[in-house]
UniProtKB/Swiss-Prot annotation:
This is Malonyl-[acyl-carrier protein] O-methyltransferase. Keywords: Biotin biosynthesis, Methyltransferase, S-adenosyl-L-methionine, Transferase. Gene3D superfamilies: Vaccinia Virus protein VP39. It is an enzyme of class 2 (transferase). CDD domains: AdoMet_MTases. It catalyses: malonyl-[ACP] + S-adenosyl-L-methionine = malonyl-[ACP] methyl ester + S-adenosyl-L-homocysteine. One of its GO terms (biological process) is biotin biosynthetic process. The lineage of its organism: Bacteria, Pseudomonadati, Pseudomonadota, Gammaproteobacteria, Pasteurellales. Converts the free carboxyl group of a malonyl-thioester to its methyl ester by transfer of a methyl group from S-adenosyl-L-methionine (SAM). It allows to synthesize pimeloyl-ACP via the fatty acid synthetic pathway.
């Protein structure tokens, strides 16, 4: 995968910090599904958990609402998220011990004492998704759980079809092979999410507010936006207006012993 400008990506996410949760409909559904996947595969209490790329804390809240966690380490590229996320945690789960590690998760070295490593809608931005699994295996105790999602190559295919813009996502088979190196009892579940919008312009606003357009470096002019909207309406109309498809792959693995 070509290296992404992570500083630019982080800056664009932060620029829509206060609006992200309002527009991140698919991402919130993914977070809910990840917690369900974890619940279906373990009933253990996690003494130490690590969440990579916590952002505004939506996965954090959902995990703590249903999963017993004693000590939670949060990570994100930007520390601006931490006070808000910490406040949410202390309001609902005041007994949970929380700390924060700022920085690029691909460059940080985590301690080797975690029971759970989680990451929601984050790994697709990494330069080396496979290395993420190696790092997770390093950070986990034997029997520890890695829980995360990526997206299939068909993700946001409507946008890619019209613009040629998109990330290079590993396939489910690639993920399965990578997981099998350090993890067992692996679960990989594809659950497409089709969102509907009133108009193509609403699609563009959704993408901008959720940071998905961070992969594109150049803003569009008025003519390009008008042309995109005409083509989108022609190709992807539905009864509710137009649609946009996310294709998440939910994944869970248990670290092998030895």
């Amino acid at each position: 995968m070509a290296k992404l400008a992570k500083q630019l990506i982080a800056k664009r996410f932060v620029s829509h910090l206060t609006e992200y949760d309002q527009y991140a409909i698919a991402q919130q559904q993914i977070n809910h599904q990840l917690v369900d996947l974890l619940q279906a595969n373990t009933d253990k209490t996690f003494q130490r958990a690590l969440e990579i790329g916590c952002g505004t804390g939506n996965l954090t809240e959902k995990l703590l609402a249903k999963i017993p966690i004693e000590h939670l380490t949060l990570n994100d590229f930007n520390a601006i998220y931490y006070p808000t996320v910490l406040q949410k945690i202390k309001q609902k789960k005041p007994l949970v011990v929380v700390d924060f590690m700022q920085g690029d998760a691909e460059q940080l070295v985590f301690t080797r004492n975690f029971d759970l490593v989680s990451a929601a809608s984050v790994v697709q931005w990494f330069d080396s998704p496979q290395q993420f699994l190696r790092n997770s295996a390093y950070a986990l105790k034997p029997g520890g759980v890695v829980l995360f999602n990526s997206f299939s190559p068909l993700n946001l295919q409507e946008i890619r079809q019209l613009t040629g813009i998109g990330l290079n996502y590993p396939t489910r088979l690639q993920w399965q092979e990578w997981l099998a190196q350090d993890f067992e009892q692996c679960q990989l579940i594809e659950q497409p999410i089709k969102l509907t919008f009133d108009s193509p312009l609403a699609v563009l606003i959704h993408l901008k507010k959720t940071g998905v357009t961070a992969v594109s470096n150049k803003p569009w002019n008025r003519h390009q936006i008008k042309q995109f909207c005409m083509e989108y309406q022609a190709h992807f109309a539905c009864e509710q207006g137009v649609y946009l498809t996310y294709t998440p792959i939910l994944m869970l693995g248990i670290k092998k012993n030895g």
